[in-house]
Amino acid sequence: MGHHVGNASTSQAWTEHCNDLIRRVCDLFPTNFVPVCQLPQSPQTPIGTSITELRRCVEEMGFIGCNLNPDPSGGYWKDLPLGDKYWYSLYETMCDLDVPAMIHVSGACHPAMHTTSSFYLGADTTAFVHFMMSDVFTDFPSIKFIIPHGGGAVPYHWGRFRGMAQDMGLGDLNERVLGNIFFDTCVYHQDGIDMLTKVIPTENILFASEMIGAVRGIDPRSGHYYDDTKRYIDATPNLDDAQRKMVFEGNARRVFSRFPL
């Protein structure tokens, strides 16, 4: 994505080219890929161009979802929280088109943040808190968001967030967020997947792995790639066969309702 590079015009042109290429790849390999688009975001700019591009991708090219960057500045967090009404016209369009958004930042520019560790996982956690403390899911009850990397720190600290929601008078956390937020399985050790599948309901977990990801090496303890997440899901004692099928396939088909059957 690279939303921190250039200006709004740069992002617009780059995004359109990237989305056209995504459509081309999906046409070349229709049994391997379905298209999800990036949006032409740029720090502190109107969200209208993202709405136009989302409609182009979904209505004209058959895309089934989008990626939403909560911090186009690359770590300086210049834009408003995801619960702010700045985002509402985009959320309205997502609901109108019935497409989910993956919440995912791009490269880190802030010298205190490493892109694929502190920035990614911190942004995942921050996005969750934005939604938890806002009225987004009340105002848009059908909206769907996927938080990657197993939700950042969220499942590990579910008790903290439950307690905060309770103290703030927000009600039961599960009821407040789990109708709209889903977590992927880009978690690179067995204990992490075990914890995710124990804390988060199966209905809210979507399978994910990497093509070129944050960790590319082989774990010397297991002899397998760190990001071979299917192995962890197959091995966890917290799922039966029916639940594994939900994680591997069923949940994604439900969340990405435009997925071609």
Role assignments for model-derived ranges:
Residues 50-54, 133, 193:
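Generic hydrophobic alpha-helical segments
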Residues 1-127:
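Active-site gating/metal-coordination segments in enzymes
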Residues 112-132, 140, 144-261:
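H/E-rich (His + Asp/Glu) clusters that bind or coordinate divalent metals
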